[in-house]
């Protein structure tokens, strides 16, 4: 077993930790075997050296080991739409809104997320504002996914070992490897994923990590405007992982018939603003908010395996808004979470 001193010396010298070594270090952190100063040293050492695909994959593997898992019966179209956040754009909750459409399409959405860190409203904040109960057991979250095709996994409920890391991250106040681990540690083990990232360099990196972790079909995306979603203001960088192969390309929303807009057109300063935007989209009100949600929901429908192409996924997303089926999913989630939390 590698000690934290040995690991830190390796990192200071600019050398990568081997996969098994990173497993050891991460387990020590998650068991509470390291002091806050030792944890901080490792995190900063990794950040300065720049985390490798192997190190990130090992860290995610251990976080999955320590997570409270969510049992899901039907896994064929199981998908997550969790992103890294941290893009600083303060848009409304695009991926959360998209989740209702994806569930209405027949996928099983295991939505993983938490409260706001860098944005005005995290997925948990807006869902709570909508009346969704977050304090559910892992078994009851699984029931939500099985019964209505959508369940929300509130990250602090499933990653309790993070209690050793959270104070250190807060005091450091800089990005660490944990800023990119959240979307890699879905407690339901979703093998299909639409993941937005806050930096262009992470597009290829996270796709390779997902491949190493055994993902089946995933799209890792970063808008050229900095958005950690598929953007409407211009091209989006994409790394698509499918059946072990990774293809990197740019996606232009104009090719799918969408008009361009700016991030300001999608702004939501508070959770209440985000709630209003989300409801407007689910009520099929036309405009940039509806367009960007259809674009991202279409991608999630595609990676979930419900459709064979992104274009088909987008068309289905638009139909589900028009029919009101996506709006019904919100009502179903509120009703079921209240019943299970009682």
From Swiss-Prot:
Keyword Zinc-finger recorded: no
Q: Where does Mg(2+) 2 bind?
A: 228-229
Q: Which residues cross the membrane?
A: none
Q: Which residues form the signal peptide?
A: none
Which EC numbers does the record give? 2.4.2.18
Matching InterPro entries: Anthranilate_Pribosyl_Tfrase, Glycosyl_Trfase_fam3, Glycosyl_Trfase_fam3_N_dom, Glycosyl_Trfase_fam3_N_dom_sf, Nuc_phospho_transferase
Tell me the residue numbers annotated for binding 5-phospho-alpha-D-ribose 1-diphosphate.
83, 86-87, 91, 93-96, 111-119, 123
Catalyses which reaction(s): N-(5-phospho-beta-D-ribosyl)anthranilate + diphosphate = 5-phospho-alpha-D-ribose 1-diphosphate + anthranilate
Q: Which positions bind anthranilate 1? A: 83
Chain sites annotated for binding Mg(2+) 1: 95, 229
Q: Which UniProt keyword terms apply here?
A: Amino-acid biosynthesis, Aromatic amino acid biosynthesis, Glycosyltransferase, Magnesium, Metal-binding, Transferase, Tryptophan biosynthesis
Pathway stated in the Swiss-Prot or TrEMBL entry: Amino-acid biosynthesis; L-tryptophan biosynthesis; L-tryptophan from chorismate: step 2/5
Give GO MF terms, alphabetically.
anthranilate phosphoribosyltransferase activity; magnesium ion binding
- List the cofactors: Mg(2+)
Its Gene Ontology biological processes? L-tryptophan biosynthetic process
Q: Which SUPFAM superfamilies match?
A: Nucleoside phosphorylase/phosphoribosyltransferase catalytic domain, Nucleoside phosphorylase/phosphoribosyltransferase N-terminal domain
Mention any one GO cellular component term assigned to this protein in its UniProt record. Answer: cytosol
What start-end ranges are recorded for coiled-coil regions in this protein?
Answer: none
Supply the enzyme class, top level.
transferase
Give the binding site residues for anthranilate 2. 169
Q: How is the cofactor bound?
A: Binds 2 magnesium ions per monomer.
Membership in a protein family? Belongs to the anthranilate phosphoribosyltransferase family.
Q: Please give the name of this protein.
A: Anthranilate phosphoribosyltransferase
Provide the species name: Laribacter hongkongensis (strain HLHK9)
Q: Which gene encodes it?
A: trpD
């Amino acid at each position: 077993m590698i000690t934290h001193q040995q690991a830190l010396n390796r990192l200071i010298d600019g050398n990568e930790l081997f996969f098994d070594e990173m497993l050891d270090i991460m387990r020590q952190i998650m068991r509470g075997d390291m002091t806050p100063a030792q944890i901080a040293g490792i995190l900063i050492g990794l950040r300065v050296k720049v985390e490798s695909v192997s190190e990130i994959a090992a860290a995610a593997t251990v976080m999955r080991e320590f997570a409270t898992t969510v049992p899901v019966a039907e896994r064929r179209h199981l998908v997550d739409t969790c992103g890294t956040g941290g893009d600083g754009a303060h848009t409304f909750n695009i991926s959360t809104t998209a989740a209702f459409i994806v569930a209405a399409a027949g996928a099983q959405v295991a939505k993983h997320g938490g409260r706001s860190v860098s944005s005005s409203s995290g997925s948990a904040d807006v869902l709570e504002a909508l009346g969704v109960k977050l304090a559910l057991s892992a078994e009851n979250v699984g029931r939500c996914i099985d019964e209505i095709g959508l369940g929300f996994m509130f990250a602090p409920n499933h990653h309790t070992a993070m209690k050793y890391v959270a104070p250190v991250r807060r005091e450091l106040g800089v990005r660490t490897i944990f800023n990119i681990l959240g979307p890699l540690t879905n407690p339901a083990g979703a093998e299909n994923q639409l993941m937005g990232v806050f930096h262009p360099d992470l597009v290829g990196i996270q796709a390779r990590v997902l491949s190493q972790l055994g993902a089946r079909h995933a799209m890792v995306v970063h808008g050229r405007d900095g958005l950690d979603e598929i953007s409407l203001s211009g091209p989006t960088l994409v790394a698509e992982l499918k059946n072990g192969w990774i293809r990197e390309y740019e996606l232009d929303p104009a090719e799918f018939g969408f008009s361009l807009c700016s991030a300001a057109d999608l702004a939501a300063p508070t959770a209440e603003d985000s709630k209003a935007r989300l409801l407007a989209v689910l009520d099929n009100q036309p405009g940039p908010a509806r367009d960007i949600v259809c674009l991202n929901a279409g991608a999630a429908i595609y990676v979930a395996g419900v459709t064979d192409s992104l274009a088909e996924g987008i068309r289905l997303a638009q139909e589900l808004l028009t029919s009101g089926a996506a709006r019904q999913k919100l009502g179903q989630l509120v009703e079921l979470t209240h019943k299970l939390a009682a």
